[in-house]
Amino acid sequence: MEKCEGIVIRQTSYRESDKIVRMYTREFGKIGVVARGAKKTKSRLAAVTQLFTNGYFTFFGGNGLGTLQQGEVIETFSSIQQDIFMTAYATYVCELLDKATEERQPNPYLYELTFQILRDIDEGYDPQILTQIYEMKMLPVLGLYPTMDKCAICGETTGHFDFSTSSNGIICHRCFEKDRYRMHLPENVVKLLRLFFIFQLDRLGNIDVKQETKDWLQKAIDTYYDEYSGLYLKSRKFIREMDKWENMLKKDSDD
């Protein structure tokens, strides 16, 4: 019998009334368990196995899937559950975590980061910015280490910088001619990318960013992920389509 604190990051139906639940836990990293009878509304496991739920779990372990015995809800993130936009971003966070990690490789920092991101989304902070911070923080988990504290080519720490996927990081104006395909980013966008990658989430505070800046950030992050991560995430595609519709609606209302 094992006990842990975890977040439900994925659930799938299994047989008539059971679920297979994927959790990211503080103690064990990512684990999978069978929750017997959890699809029944009166089941004692129904609430604690809902997507995004943070709770205490007791389970029988094994080489494959464990068997969930009981759970206690700590936090349900109810605002996320009730808002389609919050749900979309939270789903992407969980899918990225699922695809980027292996079974039973504990990473308490990553657990805490994921909890903080979901909590802040639930509390109404900008989900797009929070997700972009999470994407940058997940790069080392994927084995990706872009040079963000100095020029990736010459090592200079001062000057104007652009972002270069081919050089795996930022490059200074002295080296611009060495990469004519670099991304020409506004200075504040480069600064934010560096902050997102280097600083802890609690040091960043509540960041108020214009939509144009968020669009630049997303373009840079998406380009880097497409080049290096090897991941295809359905939830990311859905968010991008959702953002397009939201921007179109805003434009129509402004007109």
Swiss-Prot record:
Keyword flag Membrane: no
List keywords of the entry alphabetically. Answer: DNA damage, DNA recombination, DNA repair
| Gene Ontology cellular component annotations, sorted alphabetically | bacterial nucleoid
List the InterPro entries hit by this protein, alphabetically. ARFGAP/RecO (IPR037278), DNA_rep/recomb_RecO_N (IPR022572), NA-bd_OB-fold (IPR012340), RecO (IPR003717), RecO_C (IPR042242)
Q: Does the keyword DNA repair apply?
A: yes
* Gene Ontology biological process terms from the UniProt entry: DNA recombination; double-strand break repair
One Pfam entry name? RecO_C
Q: Which residues form a coiled coil?
A: none
- NCBIfam families associated with the record: reco
Q: Describe its function.
A: Involved in DNA repair and RecF pathway recombination.
The record's family statement is: Belongs to the RecO family.
Task: Kindly give the PANTHER family that the UniProt entry links to this protein.
Answer: DNA REPAIR PROTEIN RECO
* Protein name as annotated: DNA repair protein RecO
